[in-house]
Amino acid sequence: MLIKGNILNVFTDEIYPGEIKIEHGIIESIKEVNADFNDIIVPGFIDAHIHIESSMLTPSRFAEIALRHGTTSVIADPHEIANVMGMDGIDYMIDDAKKTPLKYYFTAPSCVPATKFEKSGATISPNIIDNLLSRPEFVALGEVMDYNAVISNEKSILEKIKIAKKYHKPIDGHAPLLSGKNLQKYVKHGVITDHESTTKKEVAEKKRMGMKIMIREGSESKMLEKLIYSNCDFIVSDDLKPEDLINGHLDKCLRKAVDYGMDPYEAIKLVTINPAEHYNLNAGSISPGKSADLVFIDNLRDFTVKRVVINGNTIFKKQKLLFRANPRPIDTTLHVSLTKPEDFDLKAQNPAHKSATVNLINVSDNTIITKQSSAKLSIQKKTIIPSVFEDILKISVVDRYGGNTISNGFVKGFGIKNGAIASSVSHDSHNIIVVGTNSEYMSRATNHLIENKGGLAAISNQAKLDVTLPIAGLMSDKPAKVVANNSAKLNELVSNMGCELSSPFTSLSFMALPVVPEVKMTTNGLFNVNTHQFIDIIKEEK
C-alpha cells in the first residue's frame, strides 16, 4: 500500500512531499514526489513513561482516547496493580492491552512494595523480574523507586538490576532531589533515566552523570514549561487523569512545548525517535524497516491529529476511531472491616494535657513533594483535635490487605471546611487514604469505599459522591467520558467543600508514597523520606 503526504524526517529536520510504501505493516521505501499535500505525516507518538492505572481506565479504555491524540505506543509501568494483585494484576494489564491496536510495552515493576516501610498486597521478587524481562513486551526494568536501597547496596534490588543488565534492557530511575555522592552511587549501578526532576539545576547534575531526563507533564506534576530549555530527552505523562487525557495526550504536550519556545522538530523527537531508540522499539521515525506507525497532523503549531496509522492500518480518521474496547471486569475486595469514628482519633499521651504540638504534612498544589512542619492543636476528651480554621486536617491510612490497622496524623493544604475525601488509589501500595475535618466524616467515607470495593469518595454535610473503581480499586471498565464526568462532579463537590487544590484526589493519592520527599503517611505512621525514619506525630504535650 502507498501513503502520501508531507513527510517529516526526524533525522534531517525537514519536511518534503513523498509517498511511503508499506508491506506487512513495515515501511518498505520512501520516495520524494512533486506534489502538494495539506497534512504533515510524523512518526507515531510514544509516551516513554506512564502508569495506565492512574487514568482510572483499563488499557483498552485508555487506548480509545490516546489513539485519537496520535499516541501509537506507550511504555507502561504496571506497578500500581502489581502492588495490589501481584502477577495476576500484571497479567490482567497485558491481556487487556492486547485487545487494542495501541502498542503497549511494559517495564518490570522493580519496587513492589515501593519500600519495606509500608504494606502492600504483593511482592515482586527477583525471580518474577527475571521471568518478565525475558519476554519481548517487557522492554526495561521499571523505575527503581527505592533509591535508598540502591545506595545502601541492598541485595534484592541489586539482583533485579543485575537481571536487567543480563537481558540488555535499560533501567528506569526515580530520583527526586537525589544529589552528590548518593546520586553517583545510584547511577553507578546502572540506573539511566529519571522523571522526577523539578529544577534546571537538578537536571544539569543528572545529565552530567549520564542520565536521560524525562520531562513530566501529567495531571499533578507539570514541569514542561519549567524545564523546556534543560536539554531533556523525553516528554512523558507518568500519571494522567481521564479528564486530562480526553483533552489531549502527547499532542497537547507538543503544542505546549512549541508555545513555550521549543523548536517543533526537537519537540517531536522527544516523543518519537528518542524513546524508540532508548527502549529499542522498531518505531520512532519514518524510514525503511520501521513499523508503519504514522500520524497525520495539520501543522507544527497546533498538532491537530487528522489520521492515525498503526502497522499500516488506519485506526483513526475523520474523528472516527475504528476499534472498540471490551475490557474484562474482575472482582476485587478490600480486605478490611468497616470502620468506626473512634478508629480515626489520635489520642493524647496524657489525658490531663490541654494541647499538643504535632508534626504534620504540608501539601502544595501541582507537586507531589511535601514539606514537614508542626502546629499546636488542642486536646479535647483525650483526643487531639484538628484546626479547620488553620487548614490543619486529619489524615489516615487504612490497611486494605487484612491487617485492620489505621495510622492517623495531620495534614495542611487541602482546605476542606467540612467533610472528608477518601481513595483506594494511594501510591504505591494503594491502601485506603482519607483526609477530613473530623472522625465521623472519615469513617463514613472509608466505609463507603469498602462497600463499593474501591474508588474515590467525598462526603460533606450536604452531599455524597463517588467514582467506583472495581478493578483492583484502581480502574473502571467504563468508557473514559463516563469516568471523567463522574470525576468532574466529584471534584466539584470537593471544591465546594473548600478545597482549592487543582487535583485533590491526585494530591491525596501521593500522600502515602514514601519514596518522594519530604514526609508521607503510611500504614506504619508518618515517614520522613529524607532521613528514612518514622517520626512521632506528637512532639510535645502540655
Curated annotation (Swiss-Prot):
At the top of the EC hierarchy, this enzyme's class is: hydrolase
Q: Which residues form a coiled coil?
A: none
One GO MF term, please? adenine deaminase activity
The record's section on SUPFAM superfamilies has: Composite domain of metallo-dependent hydrolases (SSF51338), Metallo-dependent hydrolases (SSF51556)
Keywords from UniProt, A to Z, are: Hydrolase, Manganese
Q: Which reaction does it catalyse?
A: adenine + H2O + H(+) = hypoxanthine + NH4(+)
Q: Which cofactor does it need?
A: Mn(2+)
Biological process GO annotation list?
adenine catabolic process
Query: Per its UniProt entry, which superkingdom is the organism in?
Result: Archaea
EC number(s): the record gives: 3.5.4.2
One short Pfam family name for this protein?
Answer: Amidohydro_1
Regarding protein family, the annotation reads: Belongs to the metallo-dependent hydrolases superfamily. Adenine deaminase family.
User: Which NCBIfam families does the entry mention?
Assistant: ade
- Name of the protein this chain belongs to: Adenine deaminase
What is the taxonomic lineage of the source species?
Archaea, Methanobacteriati, Methanobacteriota, Methanomada group, Methanobacteria
